């Protein structure tokens, strides 16, 4: 069986070399375990093997188009995720909850501990707005005084280094209702956990909803949501903590926005394989991708 693999969820033009290195590490681990991992990852529809008649489930129902019928230089996530030759790929819990779980197997979770707002397999999303010279949360922290609590000390430290509100230690949601009410909300996709479903669920948990926003604007990508807020075509967005870290490193317009709150911690992007992957290979994938 010839496998394909992809790592598209955290790849920007500036990070392609990093993604290639990440795949090289995976590939070597897999090959040492006897898995015939592909040399390179898929980045375009044209690089996926064709599936004449479309990708079908066990009942014969078409669940995704033949990659050969798609625009060759684009990458269609729903087709990639359902491709019968898929060895490994990232996806999002949103699509999984909305039906993708019937067609794939989850084999691992990445570690988010290296990012503000992450802890092991859990991540959270910073709530992002345009920079304000005197964010209300900072004034509240100053009034409480330094040393009043660990959180206060962290907030004051954040004030010294910039304008971002730090992620709560307990991982609970920190939703600044007064700041976001009536604002225009940008999001990457309706099935995105970090960009849409997480803020929706955290608002519902406190008796609110996305109706708190005056408008919802679908951007297609976390980076585009950040840019929309920076440029003023939207007022607020949420992106997962690793994407925000990437924006701080690579997106110049990230300097025009700030973190004003956080969604609660929840499971980050899962790693999946096809239902057609042999069971012994699935077991080895799970073993390799499990935390030490």
Regions inferred by a protein language model and the residue ranges of each:
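A ligand-binding cleft/hinge motif common to bilobed small-molecule-binding domains
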Residues: 91-101, 205, 230-231, 235-255
């Amino acid at each position: 069986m010839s496998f394909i693999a992809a790592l598209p969820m955290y790849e920007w033009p500036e990070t392609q070399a990093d993604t290639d290195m990440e795949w090289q590490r995976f590939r070597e681990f897999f090959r040492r375990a006897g898995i015939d991992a592909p040399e390179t990852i898929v980045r375009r529809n044209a690089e996926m093997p064709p599936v004449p008649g479309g990708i079908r489930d066990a009942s014969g129902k078409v669940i995704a188009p033949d990659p050969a019928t798609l625009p060759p230089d684009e990458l269609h996530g729903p087709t990639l995720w359902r491709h019968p030759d898929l060895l490994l790929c990232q996806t999002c819990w949103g699509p999984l909850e909305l039906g993708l779980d019937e067609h794939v197997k989850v084999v691992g979770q990445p570690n988010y501990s290296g990012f503000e707002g992450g802890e092991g397999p859990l991540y959270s999303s910073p709530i992002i707005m345009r920079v304000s010279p005197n964010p209300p949360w900072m004034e509240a922290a100053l009034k409480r005084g330094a040393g009043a609590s660990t959180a206060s000390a962290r907030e004051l430290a954040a004030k010294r280094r910039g304008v971002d509100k730090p992620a709560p230690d307990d991982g609970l949601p920190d939703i600044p209702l007064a700041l976001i009410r009536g604002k225009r909300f940008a999001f990457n996709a309706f099935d995105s956990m970090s960009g849409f479903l997480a803020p929706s669920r955290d608002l519902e948990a406190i008796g609110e909803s996305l109706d708190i926003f005056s408008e919802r604007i679908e951007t297609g990508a976390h980076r585009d949501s950040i840019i929309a807020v920076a440029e003023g075509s939207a007022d607020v967005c949420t992106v997962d903590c690793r994407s925000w870290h990437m924006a701080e490193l690579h997106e110049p317009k990230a300097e025009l926005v700030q973190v004003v709150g956080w969604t609660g911690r929840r499971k980050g992007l899962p790693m999946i394989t096809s239902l057609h992957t042999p069971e012994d290979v699935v077991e080895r994938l799970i073993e390799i991708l499990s935390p030490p």
